[in-house]
Swiss-Prot record:
Residues 28-45 form a propeptide. Keywords: Antibiotic, Antimicrobial, Fungicide, Immunity, Innate immunity, Repeat, Secreted, Signal. The lineage of its organism: Eukaryota, Metazoa, Ecdysozoa, Arthropoda, Hexapoda. Belongs to the MCD family. Mastoparan subfamily. The keyword Disulfide bond does not apply. The synthetic peptide shows weak antimicrobial activities against a few Gram-positive bacteria (only 2 on the 11 strains tested) and the fungus C.albicans. Does not show activity against all the Gram-negative bacteria tested. Exhibits little hemolytic activity against washed human erythrocytes. It is found in: Secreted. The keyword Secreted applies. AXPX repeats lie at residues 27-30, 31-34, 37-40, 41-44. Transmembrane segments: none annotated. GO terms for cellular component: extracellular region. Expressed by the venom gland. GO terms for biological process: defense response to bacterium; defense response to fungus; innate immune response; killing of cells of another organism. This is Mastoparan-VT5.
Length: 60
């Protein structure tokens, strides 16, 4: 019982952190990104590009 409560509490805290990270850009949508930011340095962009490339290869 104690382990179950600990697991649920940990999952709840993780979800709060996840949704908090999502809410940051929504709080200030007009904020400028860093001027010298490299879009390829963003891990999500790299993953999306890799998925797009793989899907193009598979669909040919």
């Amino acid at each position: 019982m104690k382990n179950t409560i600990l697991i649920l509490f940990t999952a709840f805290i993780a979800l709060l952190g996840f949704f908090g990270m999502i809410a940051e850009p929504l709080a200030d949508p007009l904020a400028d990104p860093l001027p010298d930011a490299d879009p390829d340095a963003d891990p999500e962009t790299v993953i999306v590009k890799a998925i797009a490339t793989l899907s193009k290869k598979l669909l040919r």
